[in-house]
Amino acid sequence: GAIFDVDGTLLDSMGIWKDVGVRYLNSIGIEAEPDLGTILFTMSIQEGAQYVKEHYHLSQETDEIEQNVLDIISDYYKETAPLKSGAVELLEKLRNSNIPMTIASSNNKKEIEMAFERLEIAKYFDRIFTCEEAGAGKTKPDIYLQAAEYLGSRPEETLVFEDVIHAVRTAKKAGFQVIGIYDEASKDDQEEIQREADCYCRDWRELMKKKTALTIAGSDSSGGAGIQADIKTMQANGVYAM
């Protein structure tokens, strides 16, 4: 089976999480400090709303700020969030190889469903798993293990596609085969992702250019052995850097 992250992996959407504070302040006629996006990026929405209220001396209540920020994010996924180049071709190839797929995301299910409906890719996934439902973030393997159990696929037989280092490490330690994908928001961590992941690619089109095994597990009964052999083929073909 295959488990996909969403933001930064399938969708080129990480930028909204750095821009949303600026967008909110602009909407109420306030100019944001240049590094606001970086400051808010590591905060929860609740923490960010409190920071903005206090730092910019806003009269709005924190709950109102939080809801306005959530509305901006929701509109972005409903109307704008784009697919990464080559994503549909990859999903189509996996589906044609009879490989079941699920989503494992830190985002809200509502935003994912809206974006997937607009982009017409919901059909590729059997289910969407979220960290909120799993009861833990991606520093713990719960969401991956739940997704694999749903797929009926052991970790060693399952590919996990991720773009951030902490998620790559978590999935790898849990026994999954991890493919790292480049994203601009995580560019400072790319060397670590290359070292930690089983395989790594700059983009999905790079992967699709090579004769690799996206015919992998799920198309037959070879299971983990099939994936292991195919990952070695990918590495040998130079698609990925370890």
Predicted regions and their residues:
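Conserved beta-strand elements of the Class I
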Residues: 1-4, 159, 212-214
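Substrate-recognition element of Asp-dependent hydrolases with the DxDx(T/V) motif
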Residues: 87-117, 171
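N-terminal helical cap/lid subdomain that shapes the substrate entry/recognition surface
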Residues: 1-97
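Small-residue (G/A/S/T)-rich helix-start motifs and N-terminal tracts that mark the onset
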Residues: 209-242
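Asp-based, Mg2+/Mn2+-dependent phosphohydrolase catalytic module
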Residues: 108-109, 113-209
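Conserved SAM-binding loop
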Residues: 10, 83, 101-104, 160-161
